[in-house]
From Swiss-Prot:
The organism's taxonomic lineage, starting at the top: Eukaryota, Metazoa, Ecdysozoa, Arthropoda, Chelicerata
Tissue expression notes: Expressed by the venom gland.
Main location: secreted
Family indicated by similarity: Belongs to the short scorpion toxin superfamily. Potassium channel inhibitor family. Alpha-KTx 06 subfamily.
Signal peptide from the UniProt entry: 1-24
SUPFAM superfamilies on file: Scorpion toxin-like
Protein name stated in the entry: Potassium channel toxin alpha-KTx 6.16
Location(s), subcellular: Secreted
Keyword set includes Secreted: yes
Domain comment as written in the entry: Has the structural arrangement of an alpha-helix connected to antiparallel beta-sheets by disulfide bonds (CS-alpha/beta).
Organism: Opisthacanthus cayaporum
Regions annotated as coiled coil: none
GO cellular component, one term: extracellular region
Top-level taxon: Eukaryota
Reported function: Inhibits voltage-gated potassium channels.
Length: 67
């Protein structure tokens, strides 16, 4: 039962995170690990890009990147 609850919470967090503009301060998101810039730019929509472990608004949305 606890495992089921954890899964539901995880899916909820993922779904909320994929909403447009779901960033900590509107510019940089730090609670997700981004992949390399080339992978991010290839796989993601053009609104965020990876900068280290941060998602920075500009080129692609790192939520769609392979981790």
């Amino acid at each position: 039962m606890n495992l089921k609850l954890a899964l539901v919470l995880l899916l909820t967090v993922i779904n909320v995170g994929m909403l447009p503009g779901a960033t900590s301060n509107g510019n940089i998101k730090t609670d997700i690990k981004c992949y390399r810039n080339s992978h991010c730019n290839f796989h993601c929509e053009k609104s965020y890009y990876c900068q280290g472990s941060k998602c920075v608004r500009k080129r692609c949305n790192c939520y769609n990147c392979p981790l």
